[in-house]
A protein has these predicted regions:
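Short acidic, Gly/Ser-rich segments with clustered Asp/Glu that frequently serve as metal-coordination loops
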Residues: 13-19
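Hard-cation-handling environments
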Residues: 50-52, 57
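Glycine-rich loop at the start of a catalytic domain that most often binds anionic cofactors/ligands
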Residues: 64, 68-77
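Extreme N-terminal starter segment of soluble prokaryotic enzymes
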Residues: 2-6
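Short catalytic helix/loop segments, enriched in acidic residues and glycine
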Residues: 22-46
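Internal, conserved structured core segments that host functional sites
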Residues: 90-147
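A glycine-rich helix N-cap at a beta->alpha junction
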Residues: 74-94
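Short beta-strand segments
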Residues: 9-10, 60-61, 101-106
Length: 148
């Protein structure tokens, strides 16, 4: 990892302390709590990455429109990216020279009966399958990012 740039994808449903749907809904008191926990989770990752020798960290706030991380509490060494972009990497936009990606706070895939708030991208999509196998967002995102 020495000298590399990390691209950290942050989602809310799988972050520390998110255990009800209200935690994922913009503007609720629970959402504010979840934002604080997600920011702490990401700060722990950022700190660990820098301790491991990376030269930079880009954090993509990927839950909904991407306004979940709290900028004033986020480790200042991380570059925060919000919003949804059509390219060059679908959903991600620019990758800022990242060498590898990490996924934090992702959740169960659509169609997973035992997972917490299971979905893939949106609850309107029942599930996504590739070659007959149901895939989760981390698999989908890894396949998108692998092209870059």
């Amino acid at each position: 990892m020495k000298g590399k740039v990390a691209y950290v994808v942050a989602d809310l449903e799988g972050s520390t302390g998110t255990w009800t749907k209200a935690h994922t809904l913009l503007g609720t008191p629970e959402w504010q709590e979840a934002r604080e926990e997600l920011t702490r989770d990401i700060n722990a990752v950022v700190e660990s990455l820098f301790e491991a020798g990376v030269k930079g960290v880009v954090v993509k706030d990927f839950h909904r429109a991407g306004y979940n991380l709290i900028p004033r509490y986020l480790d200042g060494r991380a570059k925060r990216v919000s919003g949804y972009y059509s390219g060059p990497a679908v959903g991600y936009g620019k990758l800022y020279g990242a060498d590898f990606a990490l996924f934090v706070g992702l959740h169960a895939s659509g169609g997973n009966e035992s997972g917490f708030l299971p979905h893939t991208l949106t609850s309107r999509i029942a599930e996504i399958r590739v070659n007959g196998k149901r895939i989760c967002e981390s698999e989908l995102f890894a396949s998108i990012l692998s092209a870059f």
